[in-house]
């Protein structure tokens, strides 16, 4: 077992534990997968991410910036010596809200995916191609230029102050969600 503890001023704030060597495929994990099957009737794809069962990716979970993310990952994989800067990647057209997965993926394609639901019984993990990194106070989302504030912060003046502050420190090419 691996345990990670977060402390502030010598006070324990958070503890995370994970079984070493166990294939957890936990929510939030990010994988580089390969499309194994396209299922037009489900408007979904099955993706190999290394789990014994293929993972499920629905069209609506591609995310609007899917084509831009694919372009970035393709550049990253083709030249591993130089990591491309996200804000310098040319933005591609957004995916249509009512599109078909076969218009964007084919068998054998590789893509970056994130687990949104852990595998259970006979089913593999559920995936999203809209990658986000969740921290304690923020969610960082590449290729989305928005700053959003949690609805739990209801005072408009505080929401505006936080938006302005976060906008001034946000890295180029990323969106941020402020959490409570």
What positions do the PLM features span?
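Single-stranded RNA-binding surfaces
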Residues: 1-180
């Amino acid at each position: 077992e691996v345990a990670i503890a977060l402390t502030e001023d010598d006070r324990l704030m958070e503890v995370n534990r994970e079984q070493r060597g166990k294939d957890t495929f936990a929510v939030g994990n990010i994988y580089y997968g390969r499309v194994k099957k396209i299922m037009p009737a489900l408007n979904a794809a099955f993706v190999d991410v290394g789990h014994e069962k293929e993972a499920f990716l629905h069209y609506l979970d591609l995310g609007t910036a899917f084509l831009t993310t694919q372009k970035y990952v393709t550049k990253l994989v083709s030249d591993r010596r130089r990591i491309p800067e996200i804000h310098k990647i040319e933005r591609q057209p957004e995916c249509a809200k009512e599109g078909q997965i076969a218009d964007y993926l084919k068998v054998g394609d590789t893509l970056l995916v994130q687990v949104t639901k852990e595998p259970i019984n006979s089913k593999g993990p559920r995936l999203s191609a809209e990658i986000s990194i969740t921290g304690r106070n923020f969610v960082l989302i590449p290729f989305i230029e928005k700053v959003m504030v949690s609805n739990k912060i209801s005072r408009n003046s505080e929401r505006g102050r936080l938006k302005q502050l976060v906008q001034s420190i946000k890295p180029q090419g990323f969106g941020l969600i402020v959490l409570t």
